[in-house]
Amino acid sequence: MVQYLAKRIGRSILTLFVIVTLVFCLLRLMPVEGYFANYEKMTEAQIQAGLQSMGLLDPLPVQIGHFWRDALHGDLGVSHIYKLNAPVTRILAQKLPISIEMGVLAMLLSLIFGIPLGLVMGRYKGRWPDKLGTAFIVLVQAVPAAVYFLYIQMYGTTAMGVGLLFDAANWRYWVLPVCSMSLANLAFYAMWLRRYMVDESNKDYVKLARAKGVSENNIALHHVFRNAMVPLVQYIPSAFLNTVVGSIYIESLYSIPGMGGLLVTCVQRHDNTMVQGIVLLYACVGIIGLILGDVLMVLIDPRINFGKKEGGR
């Protein structure tokens, strides 16, 4: 396991380096307005002097080296547009907590409803609970997310008696965005748990339990469900972290001052330093989620040995 994790972390670091470096290079192809708050009022000489002071006239490999050197010391530069001369790390530290809170609540909601739904669907395969659950999953996956997000906001704000401007101090303002963020994962957990339970139900140990007279409910809860949860567990950390960093539309829709709205604003206003800092954070979060998924899977089922799996390839 340790050897596997070492290899996985090494590959993840390489992936992180490639992704962020590629984005860094692409941002250098963008107009230079993103580095100056008052670009329209500046002369060409002032622009060139500013670019020189920021090191943007250096050769690209030199710029990449300086970026990673500073990033490894916790310095992602300063915002030039969003908040003039404010450190990128400070802005990220201000915006990330509310996105994490939203993500935690959405994950809990999706697990609380998605796991029981998948369990019931797997237990009653082909019967009306399974058919109703399947219809719900198909509806969530077939309809574009933006459509049901808008409907939830349209009818939910009236029913909840809340406005369109988010108020973090009032719990009612959290209900609609959290419900919206949880729907996709709820359907995902239910669909895959149902599928894994159906697969487990056809295995020999289940047939043996039935032959011994064990009740179907006992088999479903204590044997099939437990084994079906093992492959599903590895997706929970990455699903949670993807919810945190992938809530761009939800946060913009409800004016939530989190990471999603920050990315949209910085892209629209061409704040290149902020964009590359956000991309670095997102890449780190995604990679951490994948590694945590593997670790959690082994903790739940010690029979899994990634080292042997890799060695057999």
Identify the residue ranges that each predicted region occupies.
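Generic hydrophobic transmembrane alpha-helix motif, especially the helices
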Residues: L109, L132-A187, V264-C266, N272
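Hydrophobic alpha-helical transmembrane segments of polytopic membrane proteins
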Residues: I19, A106-G114, P177-F188, G260-V298
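Hydrophobic alpha-helical transmembrane segments of membrane transport/permease proteins
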Residues: L16-G65, G156, M160-Y173
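An internal, D/E-rich "acidic patch" concept
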Residues: L56-F113
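Cytoplasmic-entry segments and transmembrane alpha-helices of multi-pass inner-membrane transporters
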Residues: V2-R11, L117-Q153
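Membrane-cytosol interface at the C-terminal ends of specific transmembrane alpha-helices
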Residues: N170-R210
